[in-house]
């Protein structure tokens, strides 16, 4: 007994894994379905009866030909079966009714032309949009028959156009004219039929047809079995094209559907079993293939799911959806397999769609698609929505269930969404959805969007826009600050080789990125890390150990800095001092202390303009760059406050405020309300405006440096420092303009802010800087609530447009401008001028774009920390 319970326990523990493994494509079931589908057994199929020999004529009226063809079909069926042949030519007719054991064969060049004469379409038992009724006979109709076929290379033309059937839908786009179109859906027939069904009105009392405006299908077989439709072309259907209803054993093979009319579904098996649709071409005004099982109360009463359906080797062009389940799906649907199809059109809206609502109810399960190639679709590759027709008049509370849906080996080149799932609000009834080994490029709006109540929506090797899509529970970290920090550590195991360095490098980019990492370490120390591994605290400690490597490698015991030259007076080389200062505060050392003194000394002796603002570098004599304000002043302020007496420190702070304010006066452009990249005091540089000395354009990252400098200087300034307000006022002025230039669609910013040009691009480093300042500025009380909202929008835009998950589950910040600058032009310290860097738009566009540039990694980490500290990353 103990052994039995032990075995049972092991079995139960294995159930979730085994169940999930069985939930995808099932080859054995596929083969079982394929082998179970029966073709029609048409006795005496070789006996051919040509309609022209039995009274049909090309110059006869539609009524005359209708009578002749129907009489012949009945005769052939009565004789035990055979083939009724439509020879080459155009044959006008009214509704045709198929009988058992009859094949209707259209020879190549034959056109069966259905006339727009409503009286030729008598009332028959059918269903209209999933509701049982008496309505106009479909063009080709059958009821309770077996072993029938429509074959041949000819054409079945339903006669639909804007002057005939299509105008009945009540839409002016399809020819409807108020007061002119006599019969149409706007007369209320559709709503009346829906109410009859909801109220349980008996079928025989639901009589429509003449004068009611409910258009007939092109082909509709009801309660029939063993059906073949092969090779024909079907065009211009009044309504749905092929509509087998409550049928069994249906094969649709090699059919071409061209129907751009309203509700022009290509093939709609409804409450059918054992269906094969293969080698077909669909170009439709609605869904290409839509599997159905009755609408609302009628579907529940039929209680017959559509099941055991194979779709393969088809091409879908225009249409609302390629393969669709619903929306008339109250009876449920199960065991659908679609494979080896091609779909491509800017008007094809979805590839696989399941649509239903809580009027329907029903169980939709075991829906599988694989090996489908998509050029483009308009909305989503996979869409499941349980909110279809939210204003439908019906009795609600019948919650549908969608489960066990898989998509595998599907590629798409362009869409708005990759996966779009809209679950219900009350019941968790969308679950076990698996997208595996798929690649969707050119996704414009959002890679995946899942709303409502869902469970076990799994993405396995799903690549969207080059980024691996992970379920939240599969992410190694639940915060982006930690995730990108550890991703960089994994990519670059030695901190002194960050930013694509081949050898140890002293550079401002190192300091920016590593300071972001330091803030991540400090925020998540003490057991707060979201790392999914065994020892989260040790994982967090790895950050600080990584950061310690840099000063240990770059600064010797005498305080000498590898690669640093004092005489260059390069402000870029000072920026990393702020990181070293913070590390020194945590881990004091004599070497760091000496190095910091050297770097502060540089700032004390840095050449300046006549107005007292730092030159950017010796080779950039007499030039003020927005970049330089960030490179020098935050360390300048922090070091002074920490190491100088209050009076001397205040003098330093006053100097910093003066430089920030004077830079505003010299670089601000009233026309654009933006700040130019740089200013030349002499107005003589080749890139400078000869009248005011400004460069031509606003480079977004330069402005990002400038506003980050303001926030960091404010961090260093004591609360009672009198001139803080000047910086806060200027920060508000700058961020107001930044938000004005925020791209409304994406929430991020273009590389060159003052140019509208197709070559301009959305750029990640500046966008990260602006997001960081907006969010931090709000948290610190410098900026109002509207700026936090702009920051959230920006951060979400960065995630949607720039963050990529790599196959190894690291993340990357993409679309980073590698570098941009100005000159240098000829000067006393310049060895070789660089005339390419002329500040023109063409120049900015010529610089390379790359992933994981440290100038963006650091600000993105900071922006992420702001989201996390403010509880906005939920």
Locations of regions flagged by a protein language model:
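Extracellular "leader-to-stem" segments immediately downstream of a signal peptide or signal-anchor
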Residues: 2-7, 12-13, 18-103, 107-223, ...
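Short glycine/acidic-rich loop motifs that flank beta-strands on beta-rich extracellular proteins
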Residues: 81, 93-95, 115-117, 136-137, ...
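Extracellular beta-rich repeat passengers
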Residues: 329, 347-472
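CBM-like carbohydrate-recognition segments
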Residues: 449, 473-484, 488-511, 520-526, ...
């Amino acid at each position: 007994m103990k052994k039995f319970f032990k075995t049972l326990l092991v079995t139960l523990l294995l159930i979730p894994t085994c169940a999930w493994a069985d939930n995808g494509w099932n080859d054995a079931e596929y083969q079982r379905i394929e082998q179970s589908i029966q073709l029609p057994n048409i006795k005496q199929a070789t006996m051919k009866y040509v309609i022209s020999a039995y009274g049909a004529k090309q110059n006869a009226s539609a009524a005359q030909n209708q009578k002749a063809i129907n009489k012949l079909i009945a005769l052939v069926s009565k004789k035990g079966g055979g083939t009724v042949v439509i020879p080459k030519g155009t044959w006008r007719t009214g509704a045709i009714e198929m009988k058992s054991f009859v094949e209707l064969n259209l020879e190549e060049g034959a056109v069966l032309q259905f006339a727009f004469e409503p009286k030729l379409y008598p009332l028959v038992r059918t269903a209209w949009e999933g509701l049982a009724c008496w309505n106009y006979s479909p063009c080709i109709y059958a009821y309770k028959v077996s072993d029938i076929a429509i074959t041949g290379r000819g054409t079945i033309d339903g006669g639909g156009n804007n002057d005939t059937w299509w105008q009945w839908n009540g839409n002016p786009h399809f020819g409807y004219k108020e007061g002119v179109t006599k019969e149409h859906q706007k007369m209320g027939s559709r709503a009346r039929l829906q109410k009859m069904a909801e109220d349980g009105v008996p079928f025989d009392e639901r009589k429509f047809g003449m004068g009611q405006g409910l258009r007939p299908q092109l082909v509709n077989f009801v309660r029939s079995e063993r059906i073949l439709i092969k090779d024909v072309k079907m065009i211009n259907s009044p309504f749905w094209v092929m509509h087998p209803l409550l049928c069994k054993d249906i094969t649709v093979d090699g059919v071409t559907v061209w129907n751009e009319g309203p509700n022009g579904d290509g093939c709609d098996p409804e409450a059918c079993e054992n269906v094969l649709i293969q080698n077909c071409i669909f170009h439709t005004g609605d869904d290409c293939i839509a599997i159905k099982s009755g609408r609302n109360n009628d579907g529940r009463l039929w209680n017959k799911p559509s099941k055991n359906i194979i779709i393969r080797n088809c091409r879908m062009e225009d249409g609302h959806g390629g393969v669709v389940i619903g929306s008339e799906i109250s009876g449920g649907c199960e065991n659908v397999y679609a494979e080896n199809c091609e779909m491509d059109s800017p008007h094809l809206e979805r590839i696989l769609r399941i649509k239903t609502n809580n009027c329907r109810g029903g169980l939709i399960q075991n829906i599988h698609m694989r090996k489908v190639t998509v050029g483009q679709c308009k909305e989503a590759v996979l869409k499941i929505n349980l909110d279809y027709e939210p204003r439908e008049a019906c009795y609600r509370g019948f919650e549908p269930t969608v489960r066990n849906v898989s998509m595998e080996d599907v590629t798409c080149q362009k869409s708005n969404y990759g996966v779009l799932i809209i679950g219900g609000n009350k019941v968790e009834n969308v679950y076990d959805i698996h997208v595996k080994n798929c690649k969707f490029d050119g996704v414009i709006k959002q890679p995946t969007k899942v709303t409502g109540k869902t469970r076990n929506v799994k993405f396995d090797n799903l690549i969207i826009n080059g980024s691996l899509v992970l379920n939240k529970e599969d992410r190694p970290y639940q915060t982006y600050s930690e995730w990108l920090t550890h991703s960089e550590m994994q990519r670059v195991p030695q901190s002194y080789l960050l930013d694509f360095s081949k050898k140890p490098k002293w550079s401002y980019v190192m300091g920016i990125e590593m300071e972001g990492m330091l803030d991540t370490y400090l925020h998540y120390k003490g057991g707060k890390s979201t790392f999914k591994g065994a020892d989260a605290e040790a994982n967090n400690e790895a950050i600080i150990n990584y950061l310690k490597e840099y000063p240990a490698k770059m600064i010797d015991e005498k305080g000498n800095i590898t690669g640093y030259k004092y005489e260059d007076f390069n402000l870029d080389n000072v920026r990393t001092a702020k990181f070293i200062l913070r590390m020194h505060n945590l881990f004091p050392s004599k070497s760091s202390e000496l190095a910091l003194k050297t770097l502060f000394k540089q700032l004390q002796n840095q050449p300046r303009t006549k107005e007292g603002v730092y030159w950017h570098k010796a080779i950039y004599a007499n030039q003020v760059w927005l970049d330089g304000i960030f490179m020098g002043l935050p360390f300048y302020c922090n070091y002074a406050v920490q190491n100088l007496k209050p009076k001397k420190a205040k003098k330093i702070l006053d100097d910093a405020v003066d430089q920030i304010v004077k830079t505003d006066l010299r670089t601000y452009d009233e026309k654009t309300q933006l700040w130019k990249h740089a200013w030349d005091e002499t107005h003589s540089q080749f890139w400078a405006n000869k009248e005011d000395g400004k460069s031509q354009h606003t480079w977004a990252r330069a402005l990002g440096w400038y506003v980050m400098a303001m926030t960091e200087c404010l961090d260093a300034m004591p609360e009672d420092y009198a001139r803080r307000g000047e910086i806060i006022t200027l920060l508000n002025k700058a961020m107001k303009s930044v938000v004005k230039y925020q791209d409304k669609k994406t929430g991020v910013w273009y590389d060159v802010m003052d140019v509208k040009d197709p070559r301009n691009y959305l750029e990640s480093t500046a966008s990260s800087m602006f997001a960081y300042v907006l969010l931090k500025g709000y948290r610190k009380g410098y900026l109002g609530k509207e700026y936090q909202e702009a920051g959230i929008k920006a951060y979400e835009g960065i995630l949607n447009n720039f963050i990529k998950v790599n196959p190894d589950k690291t993340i990357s910040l993409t679309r980073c401008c590698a570098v941009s600058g100005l000159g240098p032009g000829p000067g006393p310290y310049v060895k070789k001028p660089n005339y390419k860097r002329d500040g023109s738009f063409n120049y900015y566009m010529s610089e390379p774009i790359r992933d994981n540039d440290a100038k963006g990694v650091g600000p993105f980490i900071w922006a992420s920390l702001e989201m996390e500290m403010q509880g906005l990353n939920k």
